[in-house]
A protein has these predicted regions:
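Core transmembrane helix bundle of multi-pass membrane transport proteins
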Residues: 18-49, 55, 106-107, 113-274, ...
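Membrane-embedded helical hairpins/re-entrant loop segments and their flanking transmembrane helices
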Residues: 34, 38-50, 55-92, 242-321
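Hydrophobic alpha-helical segments within and immediately flanking transmembrane helices
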Residues: 59, 76-85, 99-111, 327-331
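Alpha-helical transmembrane segments of multi-pass membrane proteins
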Residues: 73-82, 116-127, 282-291, 327-332, ...
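Interfacial segments of multi-pass membrane proteins
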Residues: 106-111, 309-322, 329-336
C-alpha cells in the first residue's frame, strides 16, 4: 500500500501531502527490462493495464458525446494515444487518452462548423505540441506555484466525483446497492487478496451477477455505439486554404495548450506520487505525435487522464511503460473483439471505482484546520480560486490559469510577506 507523508521543504513548507512508495519498492521496477524478466512484476503491470483500460471506457465514451463524435472512434483514438505514449511519452505509467478538457475545446467548433474540421485542427495541435517540446518550453512548468497545483488536484477530484453522480444517484435500490458493493469490494478485498487488483474483481463479480440475474440496468453499452470491428483512417474532407485555417487555428491552439498543461501537470503530480522523475520535453513531443496519429482515426485528440493514471499507479501498482502498453492493448481487444461483453458492464460499478479514485485524488491535508491555520493566507486564497474556477468552468486549464493570474496580481508587499512566512517556518523546523 501507499504511505501518506507530509512533505515540507524550505520552498513549500505547507500545502503538500505526498503518497510515497513503501521502502521495499525498487527504483528499477519501472524499467521495462526488469518487468519482462520478472513474472510477478509482469503480472502486476498487466493487471494494472486491464483495470486502467476498463476505467477509460466510460469517460472516453462520455467525452465523445460532448465533442459530437462517434464513441467508437474516440475509443480507437484512445488506443492509439495509449500505445503511442507508452513508447514515446516522458512519464512512465501515465495514461493518455481522449480527454474531457480537450472535448470541451473541440465541441463548439464541431457544432458550429462540422466534424470534418476535427482532423486538420488535431493535426495542427499535434505539430504545435511537438514544437513546444523541441523548443524546451516545458521547463516553464517549474514556475507554477504549489498552491495552484494543490487547487488543480482538489478540483480534479471534485470533477471526477461529480461526473459519477448521475450513474449511482438513483431511486433504484439495485443501482445504489451495486455502487456501495463496489466501494466495499475495492476498499476491503486488498486486505485479503493482493495478487489481483480489487477494481478488476469488482467489475468481474458484479457484471456476472447482473448478467446471470437478468437485471436490467444502465450499462456501458447504453453510453454509445459499441459495434465490433476497426474503424478506418479518416480522410481530409476540407480544402487546406486560408478559410479552413481561420476556422481551425483557435481550436488547434486551445487543444495544444490545454493538452500540454494537463499532461505536464499530471506528470508533475505522478513524479511526486512515485518519487521518480519524468522528461517534460519528451512528453510534449510524444503527446504531439500521439495526437497526430489519433487524429488520423477521427479522434478528438487527448492528453493525460489523471483519474485513470491514479487507477494505474495506485490501485493497479503500475510503474512502467508495460502497464500503459497493456492498457492500450486490452482496450483494443475490448473495443474490437469483446465489445458485446464490455457493453454489459454496469455503469454503477465503474462509478464506484471512479468515486474512490476521486476521494484518493483530493488532497485532504490541504483543508485540515492545522494546515489552514499555518499556511499563508495568500496560498489558501489562490488554491480556493483555482478550485472554484475549475469546477465552475469544468476546465482544468482555465482553473490553473486563473490561479496563476491571481498569484501574479498579488501586491508585491504581500508576496514579500508570504516569502518571509515561508522562511520563518523553515527556520522553526
Amino acid at each position: 500500500m501507499l504511505h501518506f507523508v507530509i512533505a515540507r521543504t524550505e520552498a513549500r513548507p505547507n500545502l503538500r501531502i505526498v503518497m510515497s512508495l513503501p521502502p521495499a519498492f525498487s527504483s528499477r521496477e519501472d524499467h521495462v527490462s526488469t518487468v519482462v524478466r520478472s513474472p510477478h512484476l509482469l503480472l502486476r503491470e498487466t493487471l494494472a493495464g486491464v483495470i486502467t483500460a476498463l476505467a477509460l471506457i466510460p469517460e472516453v465514451i462520455s467525452f465523445s458525446v460532448v465533442a459530437g463524435v462517434d464513441p467508437k472512434v474516440s475509443l480507437m483514438a484512445s488506443v492509439v494515444l495509449c500505445l503511442t505514449l507508452s513508447v514515446l511519452g516522458g512519464r512512465r505509467a501515465m495514461v493518455t487518452a481522449a480527454a474531457g478538457s480537450v472535448a470541451l475545446v473541440i465541441g463548439p467548433m464541431v457544432h458550429q462548423h462540422g466534424v470534418q474540421y476535427i482532423l486538420p485542427a488535431v493535426l495542427m495541435a499535434g505539430i504545435i505540441q511537438i514544437l513546444f517540446g523541441v523548443l524546451g518550453m516545458a521547463r516553464l512548468m517549474r514556475f507554477i506555484p504549489q498552491s495552484v497545483m494543490t487547487g488543480f488536484v482538489n478540483a480534479l477530484g471534485l470533477l471526477i466525483f461529480f461526473a459519477q453522480v448521475p450513474h449511482f444517484w438513483s431511486r433504484s435500490p439495485l443501482i445504489v446497492g451495486l455502487f456501495v458493493l463496489t466501494l466495499l469490494i475495492v476498499l476491503w478485498v486488498p486486505r485479503y487478496i493482493k495478487s489481483v487488483p480489487s477494481p478488476l474483481i469488482a467489475i468481474v463479480l458484479l457484471t456476472l451477477f447482473t448478467v446471470t440475474s437478468g437485471q436490467v440496468l444502465p450499462t456501458v453499452g447504453d453510453e454509445g455505439s459499441m459495434s465490433s470491428g476497426l474503424p478506418g483512417l479518416t480522410q481530409l474532407l476540407v480544402p487546406l486554404n486560408m478559410e479552413t485555417l481561420s476556422i481551425i487555428w483557435p481550436c488547434a491552439l486551445s487543444i495544444a495548450f490545454v493538452g500540454l498543461l494537463e499532461s505536464l501537470l499530471t506528470a508533475k503530480l505522478v513524479d511526486e506520487l512515485t518519487a521518480t522523475s519524468s522528461s517534460k520535453r519528451r512528453e510534449s513531443i510524444g503527446l504531439g505525435a500521439g495526437n497526430i496519429l489519433a487524429g488520423l482515426y477521427g479522434g478528438i485528440a487527448g492528453c493525460a487522464m489523471i483519474g485513470q493514471t491514479i487507477v494505474n499507479v495506485e490501485m493497479g501498482k503500475g510503474r512502467s511503460r508495460v502497464s500503459t502498453f497493456a492498457a492500450g492493448m486490452v482496450l483494443l481487444v475490448l473495443v474490437t473483439a469483446l465489445s458485446e461483453i464490455m457493453a454489459k458492464i454496469p455503469m454503477a460499478v465503474l462509478a464506484g471505482i471512479m468515486a474512490i479514485v476521486a476521494i484518493k485524488t483530493f488532497n485532504w491535508h490541504s483543508l485540515q484546520p492545522a494546515t489552514l491555520k499555518s499556511a499563508p493566507i495568500a496560498e489558501t486564497v489562490v488554491m480556493l480560486i483555482t478550485v472554484a474556477a475549475t469546477v465552475s468552468t469544468g476546465n482544468l486549464a482555465i482553473g490553473v490559469l486563473g490561479g496563476i493570474i491571481v498569484m501574479a496580481l498579488l501586491p508585491a508587499r504581500l508576496k514579500r510577506r508570504l516569502k518571509e512566512e515561508k522562511s520563518l517556518q523553515a527556520q522553526e523546523k
